[in-house]
């Protein structure tokens, strides 16, 4: 049986390490499943599989295709699928439609969103619909054009405070897990 968000939260409470890796295909997922607590199907497949410079060209259909392949190889780890660029930013209703489609098609346990304060209502909407949300803060590759590339985050006290405040707000509004990327 796959790990639930409650299992991950219990591990955190018990100060256990959570091993998380990324997979894009059945074979990789099958190999790493017994060594991981959390497997992400990342929109980084745009870089790794499609040879693109950024993750911005990845579609919901791409995520479903790779998510389903990975899902077939995951028996124990928690499976999380990235919500690609512009699949959740336009409205909470659009986010719910796309997240529901991803969860139903891939049998994943959660979806991951790169968040800002603007996406907090979307986290609430998904959580209220029974879709566990992993909130991604800090270096968010979907903001590539905003930052002028992949720029390290959290270098200043102001940026550190922003990331911490955003993380707490996400958790308060229904995010099951928060991932911080530097």
Walk through the language-model features, giving the residues of each:
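Alpha/beta enzyme core
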Residues: 2-182
């Amino acid at each position: 049986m796959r790990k639930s968000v409650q299992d991950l939260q219990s591990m955190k409470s018990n100060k256990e390490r959570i091993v998380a890796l990324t997979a894009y295909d059945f074979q990789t997922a099958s190999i790493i499943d017994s060594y991981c607590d959390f497997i992400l199907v990342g929109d980084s497949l745009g870089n790794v599989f499609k040879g693109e410079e950024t993750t911005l060209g990845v579609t919901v259909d791409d995520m479903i295709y790779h998510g389903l392949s990975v899902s077939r190889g995951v028996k124990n780890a928690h499976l999380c699928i990235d919500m690609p660029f512009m699949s959740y930013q336009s409205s909470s209703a659009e986010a719910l439609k796309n997240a529901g489609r991803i969860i139903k098609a891939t049998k994943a346990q959660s979806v991951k969103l790169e968040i800002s304060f603007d996406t907090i209502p979307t986290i609430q909407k998904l959580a209220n619909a029974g879709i566990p949300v992993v909130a991604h803060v800090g270096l968010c590759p979907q903001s590539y054009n905003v930052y002028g590339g992949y720029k390290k985050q959290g270098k200043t006290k102001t940026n550190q405070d922003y990331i911490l405040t955003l993380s707490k707000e996400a958790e308060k509004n229904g995010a099951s897990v928060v991932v911080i990327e530097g």
